[in-house]
């Protein structure tokens, strides 16, 4: 196949393709080989025994015990106050410092459970790994990212729980959300180190400008080599006397030029965006809660009215500054609790359900399923139910925390599954997505149970995210292909690309020798 309009480009394309050959070959091998390490870690690394947090089944009557515990222990300020399941049953969890261990209180006798954050982390570690009897070698509170727990995991602080196992199994757990934040062992940590060394060049992190410049130039070489090579293929007629290496190189070019251009182009875009663009995303806690004892009424409804079960319970402030309890109900209780969400707005297909299919268990960690849906609110001061809902709450929080006015709000959506704009690294479900017609084109994600701003996505970040998700990670295949199948196909393409590059170098060496 020939395209005559490309003839004027033939000479410069040939010149630059030859000049860039060695750099392109080295660059492709570095990133293709290291890229193969990513699915390798997924296939051969340690596996979770449980994909979701321990199920919370809490009696609603616990809400009346919260003010008594706080008053007895003279707690009048906290970042987060919530009731969570634990090894000892339902306990009150109080977060007073963002990076310090959380405090826990027994709701049956109001006593503080000393150093329980560590015990809670151990319990979660055993839940997720299924290692009920294996000894735990160490438990460490980690407040910074490192090579074994890189920044892409997002959650801090976490507990690093190391088991006394032959493979050095280690799990990172986030006690506020009861989430697993990462699972590794000696083998995976080593492979991950190779990946970060070869793929992201983290060894140059202390010289960021040099890293961006070198990686960017090599990626640009790959882009130019791909484009000039394809120009040659489309403008030169194959000779009947060509060697088999040249014929294979020519034919393989048709198959891999587009994926190769997608990998290198999206990688370059990702690198430059991370280095240059303003970063607006990231978890942000709500303003600290402060209160006086008389703001917490111990008379919460009647025991009869609280005779139902909850998925979660937390203390937050409404937009007027009044303390309220948020009681998260199982979905089948929505009609019985006196309040049902009627404000969920969705458009088109639910992008978070992947066309309604139940995700295979191995993909469950990436899709997520929210088990806490509707909620009702009780005034902490009066003990009576208030007419309020999650949508009103998160809209007010976005205005208070980010200064995003109601006039710019274009739509709201309850997110119950991980997807394109809100991925599994955030760990929290459900959250509310708020879309704003702001200068930055904000998509804001807020956890209604705690008031935490989980993520903020601007137009610039969204466009780069589309590029990286579709062209670099091939997530466009998710609606019709399982993750493992996708990874196998991507690995075959990378292997073919290395063969293609190797043949190109063989041709260059032979041409020079002749």
Q: What function would you assign to each model-found segment?
A:
Residues 2-514:
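Conserved histidines in hydrophobic membrane contexts and catalytic metal-binding motifs
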């Amino acid at each position: 196949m020939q395209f005559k309009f490309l003839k004027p480009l033939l000479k410069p394309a040939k010149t630059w393709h030859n000049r860039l050959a060695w750099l392109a070959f080295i660059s492709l091998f570095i990133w293709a080989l290291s890229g193969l390490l990513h699915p390798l870690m997924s296939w051969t690394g340690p596996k979770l025994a449980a994909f979701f947090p321990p199920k919370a089944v809490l009696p609603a009557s616990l809400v009346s015990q919260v003010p008594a515990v706080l008053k007895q222990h003279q707690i009048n300020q906290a970042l987060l106050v919530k009731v969570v399941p634990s090894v000892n049953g339902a306990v009150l969890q109080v977060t007073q410092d963002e990076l310090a261990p959380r405090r826990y209180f027994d709701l049956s006798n109001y006593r503080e459970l000393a150093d329980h954050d560590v015990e809670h982390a151990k319990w979660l570690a055993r839940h997720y790994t299924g290692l009920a009897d294996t000894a735990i070698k160490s438990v460490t509170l980690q407040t910074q990212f490192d090579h074994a727990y890189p920044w892409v995991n997002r959650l801090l602080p976490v507990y690093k729980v190391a088991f006394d196992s032959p493979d050095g199994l280690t799990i990172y757990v986030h006690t506020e959300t009861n989430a697993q934040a990462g699972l590794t062992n000696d083998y995976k940590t080593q492979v991950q180190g190779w990946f970060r060394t070869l793929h992201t060049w983290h060894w140059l992190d202390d010289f960021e400008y040099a890293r961006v410049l070198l990686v960017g130039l090599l990626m640009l070489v790959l882009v130019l080599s791909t484009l000039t090579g394809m120009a040659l293929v489309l403008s030169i007629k194959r000779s009947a006397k060509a060697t088999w290496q040249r014929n294979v190189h020519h034919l393989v070019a048709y198959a891999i030029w587009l994926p190769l251009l997608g990998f290198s182009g999206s990688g370059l875009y990702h690198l430059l965006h991370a280095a240059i663009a303003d970063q607006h995303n990231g978890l942000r806690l709500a303003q600290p809660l402060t209160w006086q004892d008389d703001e917490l009424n111990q008379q919460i409804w009647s025991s009869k009215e609280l005779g139902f079960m909850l998925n979660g319970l937390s203390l937050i402030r409404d937009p007027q500054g009044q303390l309220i309890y948020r009681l998260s109900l199982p979905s089948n209780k929505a009609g019985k609790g006196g309040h049902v969400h009627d404000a969920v707005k969705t458009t088109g297909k639910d992008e978070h359900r992947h066309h309604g299919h139940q995700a295979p268990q191995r993909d469950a960690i990436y899709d997520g399923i929210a088990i806490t849906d509707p909620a009702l609110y009780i005034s902490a001061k009066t003990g009576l139910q208030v007419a309020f809902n999650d949508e009103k709450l998160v809209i007010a929080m976005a205005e208070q925390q980010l200064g995003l006015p109601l006039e710019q709000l274009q739509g709201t959506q309850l997110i119950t599954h991980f997807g394109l704009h809100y991925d599994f690294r955030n760990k929290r479900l459900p959250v509310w997505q708020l879309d704003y017609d702001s200068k930055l084109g904000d998509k804001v994600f807020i956890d209604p149970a705690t008031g935490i701003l989980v993520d903020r996505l601007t137009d610039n970040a969204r466009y780069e995210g589309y590029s990286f998700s579709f062209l670099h990670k091939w997530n466009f295949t998710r609606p019709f292909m399982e993750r493992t199948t996708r990874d196998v196909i991507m690995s075959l393409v990378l292997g073919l690309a290395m063969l293609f590059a190797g043949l190109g170098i063989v041709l260059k060496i032979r041409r020079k020798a002749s």
